[in-house]
Swiss-Prot record:
GO cellular component: virus tail, baseplate
Xref: HAMAP family: BP07_T4
Species for this entry: Enterobacteria phage T4 (Bacteriophage T4)
Similarity-based family: Belongs to the T4likevirus baseplate wedge protein gp7 family.
GO terms, biological process: viral tail assembly
Region (Disordered): 1012-1032
Keyword list, A-Z: Disulfide bond, Late protein, Viral baseplate protein, Viral release from host cell, Viral tail assembly, Viral tail protein, Virion
Function statement: Intermediate/inner baseplate protein. The gp25-(gp6)2-gp7 module is involved in sheath contraction. Involved in the tail assembly.
This protein's encoding gene: 7
UniProt-recorded name of the protein: Baseplate wedge protein gp7
Coiled coil: none
Subcellular location: Virion
Amino acid sequence: MTVKAPSVTSLRISKLSANQVQVRWDDVGANFYYFVEIAETKTNSGENLPSNQYRWINLGYTANNSFFFDDADPLTTYIIRVATAAQDFEQSDWIYTEEFETFATNAYTFQNMIEMQLANKFIQEKFTLNNSDYVNFNNDTIMAALMNESFQFSPSYVDVSSISNFIIGENEYHEIQGSIQQVCKDINRVYLMESEGILYLFERYQPVVKVSNDKGQTWKAVKLFNDRVGYPLSKTVYYQSANTTYVLGYDKIFYGRKSTDVRWSADDVRFSSQDITFAKLGDQLHLGFDVEIFATYATLPANVYRIAEAITCTDDYIYVVARDKVRYIKTSNALIDFDPLSPTYSERLFEPDTMTITGNPKAVCYKMDSICDKVFALIIGEVETLNANPRTSKIIDSADKGIYVLNHDEKTWKRVFGNTEEERRRIQPGYANMSTDGKLVSLSSSNFKFLSDNVVNDPETAAKYQLIGAVKYEFPREWLADKHYHMMAFIADETSDWETFTPQPMKYYAEPFFNWSKKSNTRCWINNSDRAVVVYADLKYTKVIENIPETSPDRLVHEYWDDGDCTIVMPNVKFTGFKKYASGMLFYKASGEIISYYDFNYRVRDTVEIIWKPTEVFLKAFLQNQEHETPWSPEEERGLADPDLRPLIGTMMPDSYLLQDSNFEAFCEAYIQYLSDGYGTQYNNLRNLIRNQYPREEHAWEYLWSEIYKRNIYLNADKRDAVARFFESRSYDFYSTKGIEASYKFLFKVLYNEEVEIEIESGAGTEYDIIVQSDSLTEDLVGQTIYTATGRCNVTYIERSYSNGKLQWTVTIHNLLGRLIAGQEVKAERLPSFEGEIIRGVKGKDLLQNNIDYINRSRSYYVMKIKSNLPSSRWKSDVIRFVHPVGFGFIAITLLTMFINVGLTLKHTETIINKYKNYKWDSGLPTEYADRIAKLTPTGEIEHDSVTGEAIYEPGPMAGVKYPLPDDYNAENNNSIFQGQLPSERRKLMSPLFDASGTTFAQFRDLVNKRLKDNIGNPRDPENPTQVKIDE
C-alpha cells in the first residue's frame, strides 16, 4: 500500500509584481519535493474560466519551501497550485492559492553608493518594465566617461549623445619626445612604433627590441621576438588591426598583444581558433610595465620570402607585397598545414592565390596602407633589371607609378592616382611616401612645376602696355613652400571613397611619413634630429569598463538575479592623465543608453578612481511586493464592545463651553469618540489592557515591529530582511517560542547588533531528578530549596508518577550540593508544611528534544544567565517585553511601558479587584450540570449581543442538578490522594465537559463572580458598589 504524501500548509503569496510572483509554504519535511503549476483564470476579454478549463503549466519542482516565477504577464489573473511527492509516497493532493492579478509595472528599491544617481529611463526600462535587453550587463559593452566641471546631471537624461559636449576631451596635438637609440648596430636601421603609451624601437634583422614608457627618456632592451625583424622599403615595419599588432619579419610574420589581454582563441579578437595562442604572462619581463609579447603567426610564402617590401592589414586579412606580387592570410581561422613532411607543418598558411598590382614584376611597392577595410599600395617606380633588390639598386621612372586600391572580392587593383603624366611625375623615390590617420590618406610629393596648362592670356598687361597680346602663369592652389615636406600633400577622404587625391596643406611636418597605430589611434615618426615625434589624435576621456568578451570566464561585469533581486558587479574604474577638471563620471551602454552618474565629492584632475563599496558591487535592486488596493469596509468587532468616553463630556469641560447643538459640542463628541475607538490612542490602548482579559494581539504585534524598526534604522537591508523573515516565519507561534535560548540571542542581534551568551539549564543536555513520596507536596515547592542531612538543592519542576497505583513525585532539581540518598527525610527551607521521603536518589535523564515543551510545562523554576558587553540597564526591560516567557503578561508589560514612555499621566480614582479561576481540562467531572449553554445560530455559531458584543447564553436544562458520579471513579484514578483529597472529592463546580457549548477556548467566563468595584460614575458601574473608599 502506497501512502499519500502530506499536503503543504500555509500556501501563500509572498511577492507579487507585474512579471514575478513568489509563493511560500510550510516545509513538510526532508526528502520531499514540491511540484508547482500555474494557470490563467480569465480569458483575454476578462471573463472567468471554469476551473475544469484551466490550462495548467508545469513550472518544475523544488526541494525548497518557496518557488519564484519570473515570466508572468502584466495585468493577468493567475492561480498557482503545489503538490508534494517523495520516493515511496503517492503524490499529495493539490493545494491552491487564491486567484491573484499581476500589476502593470514592477516596484523596486535600490542600494548603491550615495554619490551615484540612476537615470530614470534606465530604472523604468530595466526594472519597472522588465526590459532586460535595454541594458544587459552580461553581454553589453559598458562605458564610462569623465564629465567636465560645468556639467549638472539630471535623471531625465536618456542618451549620451545629448550631453556628449560635456565629456572631457583634448584636441589633436603632437609631441617631440626623447631621442632614439640604436638597438644593436646602427641607428639608421631602426623602426619606431608607438602603441598604447609605449614606444618600441625595432631594428632590421634583430630579435631584440628597445621599449620606453616615459616618452623616450629611458630605454630598456628586451628580446620580444623568436626570429629576425624584416627589411621593408619604408620606415613602416608594423601594422595594426583593432586588437593585434602584426610585424613584418625577415622570414615570418609576427603578431603580438599586451600580456594582460585575453589570451585564448576567439573569433571576436581575430585570433586563430585552431590553437591556443598565449598563456597569461603578466610582467614576467620585470620591466615595471606591460609591453606587447610577440609570437610567430606564419612563415612567409616562397614568392615573398626574405624580399617583402611592405605590410598592411585589415581586421580580416594581412597583406605582404614583393616584386608586384601580393600574398595575404586570414587574421582568424587561417588555413593550417597538415602535411607532416612540410617545413611549415602545423603552422598557419597564406591563401594559395597570388595577386599582382601592376602586372610589372619590376615594379617597386614602397608602402601599403589600410583604412576602413580598403587597401592602398604606393608604386614609386621600377628596378632596372628583373629581380634586382630595390634597397640597393637604382629605382627608375615607370609608367606604372601611382596609388592603387584593392578590390579584394575580385582580386584586382585599380590605380586611383598616377593616371596622368604630371601625377606620375610628382611621385619620386626619396620624396614620395604614403600614410593615414584612420580618416585620410595622404601622399607626399616632389616640387611643383608649371605646365603649359598654367599659361593663360593676360589682357590687363596687354592693355596697359598697348601690346598685341600678353600671357601669364596661373598659380593653382598648391600650398607651395621652400620645404616641400612641410606644406603640401595629396590627400583623399571618405567623400570620394578615398579615390580622389587633391592638393591640401599638411597639419604636421612630414605628415605622409608617419606610422599609424590603430589600437591607440596615434601616429609616430623619427624626425631629422633622430627624436621620436608622436601625434595624439582627438581624445575623449571615455573607456570600456571591461574589454573581456561575454564568453570568457574572466569577465567580471555581470548581473546576478535571485528571486527578483538583482546584483550588478563591475571592476573599479580609473582614469589618468586628463588635464581638465572633472566633476563626475557617466556610465552608459556603448549604444548610448545612460545608466547612471557618479558625482565626485570635489572636482578632480589628472587621476581619479572609483572603488565600489561593497567590493565590486555597482548596484543592488530589490523587488518589492505589491498589494492591490481594497475598498474600505467597516471592521466587524466580534469581541466585547467597550464603552466610550462620550457620556463623560459634561464632566470634562465647563457648561459654558457646551451650547445646545453647537458645532463645537459636535466636534468635542466626535473627537472623544475618536479617542475611544481610534486605533493607537492612549485611552484605546489602556482600555484594551484593562477591560479585556488580554490585550489585542494585533496591536501589541505592531508595537513590537515599531520597536524593532526604531532600533534597526541604521542597519543594512540584509539585516532588516533577516528580521522580517524571522517574524514572518514565526508570527503564528511567536508567543509559544518566547523564552527559548534562540529568542534571547535573536533579540540582542536585531535590537542591538550584539552577540550574547546564554546559559540555560536546558543547554546542558541532561537533567537530574529524584523521586519523593509525600502527602504535603504542592506546586509551591517549585523554586524552593530542599535539603536532607547530607545535601541540598533547588527544585526546578515537579510532575506526578505512579508506582503500583501509589502517587509519587518526580522532582527535577539543580544546583545540588552534597548527596541525596534514598530513604532520607527531605524538607524545604521556606515551606514548613512540606515533608517527604526520598524513594530514589539522583538520576540523570535526557532533555526534551523540543524546547517548546518547557513552555508547556506547569510551574517551573529556571535560572538563565545572560552574558553581554552591553550594560544591563539597556536591555533589561526589552528582555521582559519581548522574550521573557511570562505568557500574555509580557504584552501587558509592553503596553504599560509604552504608556510610560510616551508620557501618559495617570490619576488614581479607584482600585478594581477581579478574582478569576482557570479552567483545568483535567480536573475531572463537575459536581453539577452546567448552569448555562450558549445560544447557537442555525449554522452552529454562538450568537452575540449586537450592542455589547457579549456571547448570549441560555439557562442549562439541568442547571443545579447533581452530576452523577460513577461508582468506580476513584478506582479509575488510582485512588490518588492530592492535597489530602480523593479524586471524587477534588471535583469542582464548573469543571468543563467536552460537550459543554457554554465553554470554549476563545470565550472565557468569570468562574467566580467576585468583583470589587466602586461606583464613580462610569458607564456600567454597579448601582450598589461592592467596595467604597475609606471614609466615603
